[in-house]
Amino acid sequence: MKYSAVPVIFVIAIAALAADPFYLGTWKIDSAVVGPWWNSPGKPDPSESKTLVGKTLTITPTAILGPGILGCKGPKYKVVTIPPEGLFQGAFEEMKRADKSVDVAKLAATLGFTGKTSKSLQTGCANELDFHFVDANTAEFALNEFVYTLKKQ
């Protein structure tokens, strides 16, 4: 009986592709909105958000390649599952502590988070950015009073 190495190599290649973490790849910053935690009169300065919307970042195993502060060399990725209170470094939980009538689940839903928990990618980067996943192709992060939506490319 004669065996071919091609099917074995093919299966190994498919398994390797399937093992890639879901967050790796190129993501486009699709939009930015003022974070629900903003409570000062007026709106925060949108100049930074305007420079980021439309840009891309690429998450690789060894770096996050992106504009300005979004870039990071040598990230220490950790995927965690968190409740709505934990989104955006606990901003919703802080709002709830300040005002007991705040419904954290409703706040999260305004940004697309409808489940009891969400997957979040902690990067371990100096910029302290975490990426929270609405679904496999949509993630969000907070930076300077804005929530940015990323779409996988």
Tell me what each language-model feature is.
Residues 52, 125-128, 142-145:
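Short, surface-exposed coil-to-beta transition loops
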Residues 13-15:
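N-terminal signal peptide c-region/cleavage motif recognized by signal peptidases
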Residues 40-60:
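Short, flexible N-terminal segments of the mature chain
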